[in-house]
Amino acid sequence: MSTLGILLPIALLLPLANPAENGDGQAMPRTRNLRSLSFGRTLRRLEKRGCDPTDGCQTTVCETDTGPCCCKPNFTCQISNSGTKSCSCSGQPSDCPV
């Protein structure tokens, strides 16, 4: 039997074994959207470092290893001893909202 003769019946049967269906003909809701999940984590991580990725970079822009970051007011782009850049508080900790 040729390769086409083997693959054709398999291709025809695949829609019958749809794992997205839960048996009653309804598709199961997706529990995760991995792309948006990882993007959300990146935004939270940037915000923790004093970065505001949503302000359109009206403030200081810092080229970090995870991409460009917009430093919040009272934050400056600083290079650490290991060579990585991040937004760090340039004044008193009370001047820099987290």
Curated annotation (Swiss-Prot):
Keywords: Cleavage on pair of basic residues, Disulfide bond, Gamma-carboxyglutamic acid, Hydroxylation, Neurotoxin, Secreted, Signal, Toxin. Contains 5 disulfide bonds. This is Conotoxin Di19A. The keyword Nucleotide-binding does not apply. GO terms for cellular component: extracellular region. It is found in: Secreted. Injection of the synthetic peptide causes a hyperexcitable phenotype in mice greater than three weeks of age at lower doses, and lethargy at higher doses. Expressed by the venom duct. One of its GO terms (molecular function) is toxin activity. The modification 4-hydroxyproline is found at P53, P68, P93, P97. Negative results: has no effect on glutamate (NMDA) receptors, Kv1.1/KCNA1, Kv1.2/KCNA2, Kv1.6/KCNA6, Nav1.2/SCN2A and Nav1.4/SCN4A channels, and acetylcholine receptors alpha-9/alpha-10. The modification 4-carboxyglutamate is found at E63. Residues 20-49 form a propeptide. Residues 1-19 form the signal peptide. The cysteine framework is XIX (C-C-C-CCC-C-C-C-C).
